[in-house]
């Protein structure tokens, strides 16, 4: 009952909600991004074995962001978070040239899942502050993003530690809500 009333007020006040699944390979910066958005500061992180979930407010949208660990042994568990996901944030370590193909394979596998067929995709090309980082155009090519035809997608260059690009990514997601 309480949830129904809060949703009614949210709709009357123009407040919207979006369920986001944030995934990517281990050490890509997912947890750092989540807490930079939530708290506005850098937090010391350890590898995420399960998940972190936080609500991030941006403009009139309440994003519920599920940050799920990216270690290879726990990636099969990602599927348990797919239900009701409206947006996917796939975080890529722009400096990790050795694993960009692995990142592409994981993303393509996810995008083939029926439960995610209606989810929009935001790729965050993270760690742009590092000197050897691939730019967004190079990551777009290496991740095969131009071949995605069945959903809206966007790539944003980011630096989780400074916050550069994070709100531009949220801006794109916020424009997708209700489309």
UniProtKB/Swiss-Prot annotation:
Molecular function per GO: GTP binding; GTPase activity
Keywords annotated in UniProt: ER-Golgi transport, Golgi apparatus, GTP-binding, Lipoprotein, Myristate, Nucleotide-binding, Protein transport, Transport
Main location as per UniProt: Golgi
Record carries keyword Metal-binding: no
Species of the source: Candida albicans (strain SC5314 / ATCC MYA-2876)
Top-level taxonomy: Eukaryota, Fungi, Dikarya, Ascomycota, Saccharomycotina
Gene3D superfamilies for the chain: P-loop containing nucleotide triphosphate hydrolases
One Gene Ontology cellular component: plasma membrane
Biological-process GO terms, alphabetical: cellular response to reactive oxygen species; intracellular protein transport; vesicle-mediated transport
Lipidated positions per record (N-myristoyl glycine): 2
Localization, UniProt: Golgi apparatus
Protein name: ADP-ribosylation factor
Annotated GTP binding sites: 24-31, 67-71, 126-129
Record's keyword annotation contains 4Fe-4S: no
Record family assignment: Belongs to the small GTPase superfamily. Arf family.
Primary role: GTP-binding protein involved in protein trafficking; may modulate vesicle budding and uncoating within the Golgi apparatus.
């Amino acid at each position: 009952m309480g949830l129904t009333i809060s949703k009614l007020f949210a709709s009357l006040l123009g407040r919207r909600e979006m369920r986001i699944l944030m995934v990517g390979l281990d050490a890509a910066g997912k947890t750092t991004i989540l807490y930079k958005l939530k708290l506005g500061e850098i937090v010391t992180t350890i590898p995420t074995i399960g998940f972190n979930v936080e609500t991030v407010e941006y403009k009139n949208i309440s994003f519920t962001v599920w940050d799920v660990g990216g270690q290879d042994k726990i990636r099969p568990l990602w599927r348990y978070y797919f239900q009701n996901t409206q947006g996917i944030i796939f975080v890529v370590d722009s400096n990790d040239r050795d694993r960009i193909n692995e990142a592409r394979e994981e993303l393509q596998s996810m995008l083939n899942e029926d439960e995610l067929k209606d989810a929009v995709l935001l790729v965050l090309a993270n760690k742009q502050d590092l000197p050897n980082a691939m730019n967004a155009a190079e990551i777009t090519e290496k991740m095969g993003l131009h071949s995605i035809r069945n959903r809206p997608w966007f790539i944003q260059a980011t630096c989780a530690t400074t916050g550069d690009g994070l709100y531009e990514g949220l801006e794109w997601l916020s424009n997708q809500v209700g489309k």
